C-alpha cells in the first residue's frame, strides 16, 4: 500500500525503495494489529480464546506477521493498538522476512513460536539477509538462526533451489507439518527448534 503512490508517480527506484519500505511495512503491521484487536474484542461474542490467536501470512503478508511478532518482542510503540499484554499464540510465515534499519535484528525477548517456510533461491523475499540503503531485510534463514541461538521455539522448512513458490506451496502440500506445529508448539507449548531441508513437493517427515 505504501508503495502504490510512489510507483504511480514514477518515484519508486532502487535509491528510494529502502527509505519507503520500512514505512510500508509499518502500515501493514498497523492493519494487522487493528484486525487482531477487533477479533480479540469479539472473543466473547464469537466464542474464541484471544490467547490462541495465530498470525499467518504469505509473501508480503508473511513479512507483516513476522514484523508484528518482532515488534511485540521489542515492545514497539505500535503494539499499543493491541490489548494489554497480548501476544500471538504462534506465527506462520510462508516466504517472509523482518525489516529493520539496524545492521542486525535484536530481540528484547523471545517471540511466540514461529513456523517458517522459504526457498533459498527466492528472488522476491531474501532467504538470508539483504542490506540496502540503510534498511535491512532479514529472511527466514537469518531469523531461524537467531531463534535457535535464543532457544525460542520454531520450525523452519527450507528448500534448496526453490524460488518464491514457498509463498504458496506449503498451504496445500505441508498441512500435516502445519497441523503438528499448531498442536505441539502452539497448543501444547512444547519446546522445539527444528530445521528441515526438503524438496519442493516433499511432505515433511512426522516428528
Language-model-derived ranges and their functions:
Residues 4, 66-68, 103-105, 126-129, ...:
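Short, solvent-exposed loop/turn and secondary-structure capping segments
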Residues 30-37, 41, 141, 145, ...:
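Solvent-exposed, polar/charged alpha-helical surfaces in well-ordered, non-transmembrane soluble domains
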Residues 22-30, 134-138, 169-172:
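Soluble non-cytosolic domains of exported or imported proteins
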Residues 1, 60-63, 96-100, 121-124, ...:
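Solvent-exposed loop/turn segments at secondary-structure junctions
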Residues 1-48:
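Serine-hydrolase catalytic machinery in alpha/beta-hydrolase-like enzymes
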Residues 30, 34-110:
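Primarily recognizes the serine-hydrolase "nucleophile elbow" in alpha/beta-hydrolase
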Residues 79-151:
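The feature captures the conserved acid-bearing segment of alpha/beta-hydrolase catalytic domains
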Residues 145-207:
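C-terminal catalytic histidine-bearing segment of alpha/beta-hydrolase fold enzymes
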Amino acid at each position: 500500500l505504501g508503495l502504490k503512490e510512489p510507483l504511480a508517480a514514477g518515484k519508486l527506484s532502487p535509491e528510494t525503495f529502502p527509505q519507503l519500505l520500512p514505512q510500508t511495512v509499518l502500515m501493514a503491521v498497523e492493519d494487522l494489529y487493528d484486525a487482531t484487536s477487533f477479533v480479540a474484542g469479539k472473543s466473547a461474542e464469537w466464542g474464541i480464546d484471544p490467547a490462541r490467536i495465530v498470525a499467518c501470512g504469505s509473501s508480503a503478508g508473511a513479512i507483516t506477521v513476522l514484523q508484528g511478532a518482532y515488534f511485540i518482542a521489542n515492545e514497539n510503540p505500535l503494539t499499543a493498538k493491541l490489548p494489554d499484554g497480548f501476544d500471538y499464540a504462534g506465527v506462520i510465515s510462508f516466504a517472509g522476512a523482518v525489516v529493520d534499519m539496524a545492521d542486525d535484528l535484536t530481540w528484547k525477548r523471545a517471540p511466540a513460536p514461529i513456523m517458517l517456510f522459504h526457498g533459498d533461491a527466492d528472488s522476491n523475499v531474501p532467504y538470508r539477509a539483504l542490506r540496502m540503503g540503510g534498511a535491512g531485510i532479514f529472511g527466514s534463514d537469518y531469523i531461524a538462526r537467531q531463534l535457535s541461538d535464543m532457544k525460542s521455539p520454531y520450525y523452519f522448512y527450507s528448500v534448496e533451489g526453490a524460488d518464491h513458490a514457498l509463498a504458496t506451496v506449503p498451504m496445500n502440500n505441508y498441512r500435516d507439518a502445519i497441523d503438528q506445529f499448531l498442536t505441539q508448539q502452539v497448543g501444547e507449548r512444547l519446546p522445539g527448534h527444528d530445521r528441515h531441508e526438503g524438496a519442493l513437493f516433499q511432505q515433511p517427515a512426522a516428528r
